């Protein structure tokens, strides 16, 4: 079974994302910030990461840059899922190594399509 790490400081968003991803066949882990997510990835690199931008301790973009520098960190498909909708944020995320970028609010069809487009 494929694994997805949902990284968002909102428990509600994590719960909604968990339900959507479990319905399409993913095993889910959750992290509330980038620091916790990095520790999780070092212990067990997931197949995919659904990532928020604005979080305490370490932002999503800081996490992504750190992840891509880790051994095996190039492997997970990273989908930013955030309220940041301007072109500068999208460009920065893609240049840092994000595979896809979606805006909140999101639904199951969008998440499934973006993961499929990224090869999962």
Task: Please report, for each region that a protein language model flagged, where it lies by residue.
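Charged docking surfaces used in two-component/phosphorelay signaling
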Residues: 15-23
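Short hydrophobic/Thr-rich beta-strand motif most characteristic of the beta2 strand and flanking loop
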Residues: 25-32, 40
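Acidic catalytic/metal-coordinating carboxylates
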Residues: 33-36, 59-65
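Active-site beta3 strand of CheY-like receiver
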Residues: 44-50
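Receiver (REC) domain active-site loop signature in two-component systems and cognate sites
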Residues: 55
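Alpha4 helix (beta4-alpha4-beta5 surface) of REC/receiver domains from two-component response regulators
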Residues: 62, 85-100, 113
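A Lys-centered signature of the CheY-like receiver
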Residues: 104
């Amino acid at each position: 079974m494929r694994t997805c790490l949902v990284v968002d400081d909102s428990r509600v968003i994590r719960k909604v994302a968990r339900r959507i991803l479990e319905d399409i066949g993913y095993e889910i882990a959750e992290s509330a910030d980038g620091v916790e997510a990095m520790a999780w990835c070092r212990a067990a690199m997931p197949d995919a990461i659904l990532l928020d931008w604005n979080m305490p301790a370490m932002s999503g973009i800081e996490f992504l840059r750190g992840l891509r520098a880790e051994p095996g960190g190039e492997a997970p498909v990273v989908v930013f899922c955030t309220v940041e909708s301007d072109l500068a944020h999208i460009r920065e995320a893609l240049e840092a190594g994000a595979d896809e970028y979606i805006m909140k609010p999101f639904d199951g069809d969008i998440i499934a399509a973006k993961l499929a487009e990224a090869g999962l």
